[in-house]
Structure formats: structure tokens, C-alpha cells
Amino acid sequence: MINWIKKKLTGILVRYLTAKVRNYEPFAVSEPEILETVLQIADVILVEGNQRFSAAVKYLTRSTWSHAAIYVGRASNLGNLPDGTPAVIEADLENGVIAVPLSKYEGFNTRICRPAGLNKSERREVVQFMVDSLGMNYDLKNVIDLARYLIPTPPVPNRWRRSMLALGSGDPTRVICSTRIAQAFQSVAYPILPRIERLTEKKCEQCHETVREILHIRHHSLFTPRDFDVSPYFEIIKPTIQRGFDHRQLTWNETAVRS
């Protein structure tokens, strides 16, 4: 009985959190066809969502980006997608880890984050990790945590905001959008935002001191969409620039330009 009530309440919360908010402003929108021309497999696509859930994530992370997905190329025997469909894999609040068409994010503000230096084999490993994750459940224990902070001025100190997104079940079969992507990159020893320890060494009395950096992997549950944006190891790809932007070809409103 208790489990039934809990499931019912969670369902109500999910429907509430996935409701769309008003006044969504598209300012960094690229057509799916244009995105596909610049995307490479294992690129991370950050999205500014238009749901209440998105507002909570953006508040807690103090970021524009509320969702992350990973580009896996054209579908081939990938879930229910027709073969040849440009596809991304994401963790969805209602459906868990799923493959969806790239066109799902048409009209949304997006950003492409590209892992620098990954070779083709490593990119394929990252993608395969995500493919193997299909069907995993979304960690709905985070739903209650996020719902609490949808009041206008949530009383959450800055130092606690990240931990609010790591209060989930701890069940490895349950994920949120950015955690599984973080694990995919960690599986090929690729850094996102590692903790850096600096060790000072001196090999002899007359030798100069040297500083060596040791990277420590952060737990995947602590990663948020924002981390791929601020990571020094991911390149920001702008489709407009990649496709040969020339400001001289723009048509301006003459009155606005002169004023």
C-alpha cells in the first residue's frame, strides 16, 4: 500500500515537473540539419529545457543548461528509431535512458561540447557505453529533492546546491541525465572536472622543487550539465562559425545600425 502511494505521488510530481514553463526564449538555436553537419559521435549536447524540472536544475547549478545528451551518430538498430536517423542518447525523467532523434531539440537553446583529443576508437567506446545503458531507469529519488527547490527563492546555500543533485538512490541501475554521460567518459579515462592534487617534490638537497599534478576522479553523481560547458577539456563548437560565418553577408536594419 505504501509503495503504491509512493509511486502515485512520484507520478504526480513527474507530471508537475515536466510541465512546460511560459516565456521560453530561444537565443542559441540551430536547425537539426545544421547541427548534424558539425557533430561528431561522443559530442555532448547541452540543452536549456522548457520544463519546471529544467528551472530547478538551472537554479541549483546556476547555469543556462538543464539537460545533457550525447550524440551517437545515425541510428543502426537503436531502440525504436528508424535506421539512418541522426540520434542522441539521454536520460529522460519519464522514460529513463532512451535513444531519441536529434530533431527532438529543434527550437531549443543548445550547445555542443566536444571532448578534445579522443581518437575514433575511444569515441566509439563512449558511444557503446551509452548504448549499453539503454533501458536504465531515471533516478526518481532526485525528483522530490528538485521539487523542493521550485519555490521562488529557495533557501539553499551555494555550497549545498551541487549536493542537492547527488541525493539520489545510489542504485547503479538508476541515473540522471549527466551522470551516465560522465561515467561514459570516465570509462575511457577522459577528464571532465577532476579534483587536482599538486605534489611538491625535491629529489635531492641541491635540486629545484618540482610540482606534479595528480588527477582524482570525482564521483559521477556530482556531475551536472554545466560541468561539460566549463570543463577545460571540452571544446565549445558553434555551428554558425564552423559553417563559415561572414559578418559582411549579414543584412541589418539600417536605422538600428546607425543609432
What is the predicted function of each stretch?
Residues 1-259:
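Cysteine-nucleophile amide-bond enzymes
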